[in-house]
């Protein structure tokens, strides 16, 4: 029973309360801080657990009243109201019992790349990046472009950005995958709909402590920066290309005039890619964990279609279709895509955990 699974949380919460009132703990600031954080992390689930147990107790008491002729009718009404609360509380508790993604609080590095479709794909990279930027503005997040490769036709062949803020990874991790766009290009005289595709990768930002890179594993090349059409935009060798020899990962950055700054940004992207690689390998080795990575793991899969003539956006992972594409691309409706993805993700974890 669910109630039995809640007992250890309540016991630990009470135990921590007693420990925090002990003179031995109050005199040790570091230990007290650690225990306080642990107790605080249990507060929500303990509150729900106590509410759940209270409702069950009230249901049992009310059932006893059914045998009293004078109280039976009133008891039936009370019982209905109480029993309605049980599935709601159980769902709330199950969500609180889910293992937390340790990366959810992190900032992200997001990479958008043009795929099939040539100029149209590059233009859509620009469109989708603008949608993410507008969404970030609504969330009070900060966007910093780390690297970009503009396209002659508009948009970008590739753009890499750092997005900082509260719960960024938890919201945008579902964007990883192939995004397909269907629309009539501006240069199309016959009005035919063209299909193109771009890829999006979303990686948690990591610090130097988490990813240690041996300098001997790096091959660093410097060169002159180039702009659209390949023309030189800098007379100094400021562009940097870093190759991580053990994995073959290559990162290039030329956005800054300073070679040092370009190297710093390239290293930030490389660390994120290495961390992401480790994370994906760990998921692949753990089948139980892999089954829980709904919407975050398969980078090659087509996750979404944007059909401009129909004003339609379809997310293929959860068969979600919205006929409000214009508003979505303005960033204002992004939550209407993300919330159902989170709900689907959580329901699959609940099922996998047997809750």
From Swiss-Prot:
Primary location class: cytoplasm
GO terms for cellular component: cytoplasm
Pfam families noted in UniProt: PCRF (PF03462), RF-1 (PF00472)
Modification comment: Methylated by PrmC. Methylation increases the termination efficiency of RF1.
Sites of N5-methylglutamine modification: 231
GO MF annotation: an example: translation release factor activity, codon specific
Keywords annotated in UniProt: Cytoplasm, Methylation, Protein biosynthesis
Subcellular location: Cytoplasm
Transmembrane segments: none
Superkingdom of the organism of origin: Bacteria
NCBIfam families the UniProt entry points to: prfA, PRK00591.1
Record's function text: Peptide chain release factor 1 directs the termination of translation in response to the peptide chain termination codons UAG and UAA.
PANTHER family cross-referenced by the UniProt entry: LD18447P (PTHR43804:SF7)
Family, per entry: Belongs to the prokaryotic/mitochondrial release factor family.
Protein name: Peptide chain release factor 1
Gene name tied to this protein: prfA
């Amino acid at each position: 029973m669910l109630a039995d699974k809640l007992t250890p949380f309540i016991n630990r919460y009470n135990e921590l309360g007693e420990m925090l009132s002990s003179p031995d703990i109050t005199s040790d600031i570091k230990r007290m801080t650690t225990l306080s954080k642990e107790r605080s992390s249990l507060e929500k689930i303990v509150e729900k657990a106590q509410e759940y147990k209270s409702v069950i107790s009230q249901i049992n008491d009310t059932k006893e009243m059914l045998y009293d002729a004078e109280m039976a009718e009133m008891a039936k009404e009370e019982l209905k109201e109480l029993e309605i609360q049980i599935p709601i509380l159980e769902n709330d508790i199950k969500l609180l019992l889910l293992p937390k993604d340790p990366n959810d609080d992190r900032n992200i590095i997001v990479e958008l790349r043009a795929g099939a479709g040539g100029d149209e794909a590059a233009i859509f990279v620009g469109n989708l990046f603008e949608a993410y930027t507008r969404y970030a503005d609504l969330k009070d997040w900060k966007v910093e472009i780390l690297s970009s490769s503009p396209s002659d036709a508009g948009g970008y062949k590739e753009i890499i950005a750092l997005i900082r803020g509260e719960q960024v990874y938890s919201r945008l991790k579902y964007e990883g995958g192939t995004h397909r766009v269907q629309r009539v290009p501006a240069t199309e005289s016959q009005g035919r709909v063209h299909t193109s595709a771009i890829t999006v990768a979303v990686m948690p930002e990591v610090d130097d402590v988490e990813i240690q890179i041996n300098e001997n594993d790096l091959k660093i090349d410097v060169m002159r920066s180039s702009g659209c059409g390949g023309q030189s935009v800098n007379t100094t060798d400021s562009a940097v290309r870093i190759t991580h020899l053990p994995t073959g990962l290559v990162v290039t950055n030329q956005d800054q005039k300073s070679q040092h700054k370009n190297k710093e940004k390239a290293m930030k992207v490389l660390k994120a890619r290495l961390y992401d690689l480790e994370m994906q390998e760990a998921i692949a080795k753990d089948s139980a964990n892999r089954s829980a990575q709904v919407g975050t793991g398969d980078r090659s899969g087509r996750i979404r279609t944007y059909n401009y003539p129909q004003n339609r956006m379809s997310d293929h992972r959860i068969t979600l279709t919205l006929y409000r594409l214009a508003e979505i691309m303005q960033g204002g409706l992004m939550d209407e895509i993300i919330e159902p993805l989170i709900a689907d993700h959580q329901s699959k974890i609940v099922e996998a955990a047997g809750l």
